[in-house]
Amino acid sequence: MTSMLFYFLSLVTVSPEPVNDAITSTSAMAMKKVDSAAEHLDLMWTIFLFNSLAVITTSVGSGLLPFVQNVSIAELKMRAHHQRYMVFSVKAEQLFQLVSTLIKDSAERLNPGIAILRAQDNSETKSSIWERAKYSKEHFRLLAYVIPYLIPVIALTLNGMLLGSMFSFFIFNGALPFYNLIGPLGIVLGILYSVIYFLAFILPHGIIELPVIIVAGALGYRFASIYSDKIVKDRLLSGDEAESLEKDISYLNSIATEYIRSRYLWTMVGMMLILLLIAAYIETNITPNVALQTADFIDRLLS
């Protein structure tokens, strides 16, 4: 719905051609890697390869990304021994203060756990490790809380935006030609034609592929909720010394490691890969014929 509204507003404020060109060029960019790989692999295997990478990144990557906190603590410790580096790092962090504030305020509205975290005692003692950074203890804990959610949320959002933009493109570009031919009634016929053709173009393989993507996102999101809830409930990363933070991060790493090594996760990944292979076969061998036959059938009805 958001994509359709954005597309409609774009058509109202500018001429249709640049908007359509932008969507088609964006779709072309999204397919560029697939087309390039298809020069060396069969199209079915190319589609399967990139869909598999997306699903594995969304589900497994959510458990890998939190390990970046190890680098953050090591970097803070290094500042104690390198004054010039600390000054440079603090100045660099100042550039991102506005962005971090916007993200923090927006995320709090979406996830109640963030409000609980901010309400906890995030005070800092003198000569604490946080004096070496421009960001506060609260900011660090918020970042640790949000990081596991990034991959599943971004993956599902991008897939939704791409699918919504394609749907909007089909709808409005189907309605306009029919309107030019037979007037206002043509809008209804054009939308109906576009919806049916879009479903024929997506559903044969999408009825398998889309749920797999959603399940991958759900796996990553479920891990993120467990990981982040631990930060809030156990008041982790609330210390002022590197040793205390390293102990908490080691505990969080054990949660992420358990998730990555879990039999349940890899069983689900295996099942998703099998379904993606079936979807890729349908997309390359069945969907084009279904879409073509559907378009011919609608053309005969309208003629």
Describe these PLM feature segments:
Residues 59-123, 142-180, 210, 214:
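Transmembrane alpha-helix/helix-exit interface in multi-pass inner-membrane proteins
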Residues 7-29, 73-80, 290-294:
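Interfacial/capping segments of alpha-helical transmembrane domains
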